[in-house]
Amino acid sequence: MVALQRLDDYLTDYQYFFKNKTKKFFDKAEKYSKGIFLSRERNIERICESHHDTEYYRMQHFISDSNWDARGVIDKSAIGTSHALPKQKLAGLIIDETGTVKKGDKSVGVGWQYCGNAGKTANSQVAVMACLSNGDFASMVDARLYLPQGWCSDKKRCDEAKIPDENRVFKTKAELAFEMVQHQLQLGVEFDFVGADGLYGNDVELADKLDGLGCLYMLDVHRDQPIFLEKPQWHVPPKKGNAGRKPQIEKPNQPSLRVDEYCKALDKEDWEEIKVRNTAKGKLKGMYHFCPVFILNKTRRSFKKRLLVIRKTKTKKGEEVKYSFTNANLAQYTEKALAYMQAQRFFVEHCIKESKSVLGMDQFQTRKWQAWQHQVALNIMISGFLLKEKLLCFNDLPLLSAADIREWLCFKMLQTRTDEEMIELMFFRHLRRQQDINRYYKTDELINVSK
């Protein structure tokens, strides 16, 4: 029962946030959290069914209407994750968005928008998420619901979803990402760099704002991102021919170049191979190229010097190329450190997948603003517990997954097998997992991918 006791102790440490001036809600928080592990479908009705003594309407009220401190829960989890992560490598605050396909038009923030989970435009709910990572360990630390412009300008919908007045202002995903970075800094969460995909990397204003905060960043960019190899000067171009008016608008005195065009022009000797880290599918390695470039902020009409990082990796479909900008330079960081930072975006995707497949983040069926905030807060809180369990058990169980922890807790709560049967089941599962890993390495020696 040791793991269950650790879960109880962990949850008890959060009980201060589950109350208001007249009521305490910790018993509901505890049952909901354990129900996430017990129930196959993680909506309120199924979670209540996993606890036979829990009334559905009281749990519904706890999630949708009670005024406990969801932000306090998220912030405590973020600080706990910051303290728990090993300080072995550069810590990254990695940002990504995630979408969940929805039916109907009542769920808060739902709309016809691009949904990464579906890989297309769909009727969906989208959130911007942040995870904290160091080495091979990571956990979610923040989340902001994205409200499309149509929602912010529709008072009736906002009233029905009970969205607070201060949150009825349209913010882009990049603006939500910047708010999260600012908030983590204010909390004292420790991270060495900010990472994100091309949606955020192509937002030059976000990069400038991060620069203004003194944050190191490694942001992916799209292949059509324009760059300048030398710092341009502003000038009014000369008039061409006799027809037309004389040019009056200043432009850069040299043409820009797309990053993919620049990449195609590189020679073989312009690349170097870097082995980044061990993974479950062999060593993560690639051919890397680094080049100082200048990028244009059209809004501020300014040029900023950045380091372009390009990685080429072989895949089953051929070759994959990844482009990133960073405000780091090679005098501060080694090529391997920069390659490591670029590769860390994997972990926010993994955390989101874990939050959905193991903790049911994509199974919310509530409609109100506060309900979404409450369920995400509970989800992030449990993510912090999973991280601590992985770290605690690492020396004995380096391949322990969130799904393993969930299954073990379910087993202890339901006690459908003996301890010996459950340990044997997990042993053979990890043995098969290790055998799959070893197939990707040439050597016969067992390799611990988490080290």
List each model region and its residues.
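Short, solvent-exposed helix-loop connector elements
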Residues: 18, 333-342, 357-373, 393-394
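An anionic, glycine-rich sequence signature occurring as long contiguous blocks
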Residues: 136-162, 222, 227-347, 411-414, ...
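Generic structural signal for hydrophobic core residues of well-folded globular domains
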Residues: 36-40, 51, 63-66, 328, ...
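Conserved nucleotidyltransferase catalytic core and NTase-mimicking acidic/glycine-rich helix/loop elements
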Residues: 386-416
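Hydrophobic, well-ordered secondary-structure elements that form the walls
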Residues: 349, 381
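Conserved, well-structured functional cores that handle cations and Mg-NTP chemistry
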Residues: 1-195, 199-229, 233, 240-259, ...
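Long, charge-rich low-complexity segments
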Residues: 420-451
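Charged/polar, low-hydrophobicity segments characteristic of intrinsically disordered regions
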Residues: 68, 103, 158-161, 406-431
